[in-house]
């Protein structure tokens, strides 16, 4: 029973320490912009896993990669802190 409780707590903690969102470029001319795509899920999945995420896909309507399970240390795009093109 104790092992089950520890397992549930561990899963909860892992869930709290990850986030989902649009990863952004951290350098170059596109700094602060979402990583763009058209229909290439493999590309986005690779970019997301390289950043420590669990998976990723191309969100077609936004033309940008969307990552799931990113570490909190990875910057993601937010409307409030949008610096793309500035």
UniProtKB/Swiss-Prot annotation:
One BP term from GO: defense response
Sequence ranges assigned to domain LCN-type CS-alpha/beta in this UniProt record: 19-85
GO terms for MF: sodium channel inhibitor activity; toxin activity
Primary location group: secreted
Protein name as it appears in the record: Neurotoxin LmNaTx1
Lineage: Eukaryota, Metazoa, Ecdysozoa, Arthropoda, Chelicerata
Entry text on domains: Has the structural arrangement of an alpha-helix connected to antiparallel beta-sheets by disulfide bonds (CS-alpha/beta).
Tissue: Expressed by the venom gland.
Keywords: Amidation, Disulfide bond, Ion channel impairing toxin, Neurotoxin, Secreted, Signal, Toxin, Voltage-gated sodium channel impairing toxin
Function in brief: Binds voltage-independently at site-4 of sodium channels (Nav) and shift the voltage of activation toward more negative potentials thereby affecting sodium channel activation and promoting spontaneous and repetitive firing.
């Amino acid at each position: 029973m104790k092992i089950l409780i520890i397992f549930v707590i561990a899963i909860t903690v892992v869930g709290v320490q990850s986030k989902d969102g649009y990863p952004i470029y951290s350098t170059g001319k596109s700094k602060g912009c979402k990583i763009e795509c058209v229909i290439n899920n493999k590309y986005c999945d690779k970019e997301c896993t390289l950043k420590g995420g669990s998976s990723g896909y191309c969100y077609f309507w936004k033309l940008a990669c969307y990552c799931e399970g990113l570490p909190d240390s990875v910057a993601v795009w937010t409307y409030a802190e949008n610096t793309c093109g500035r």
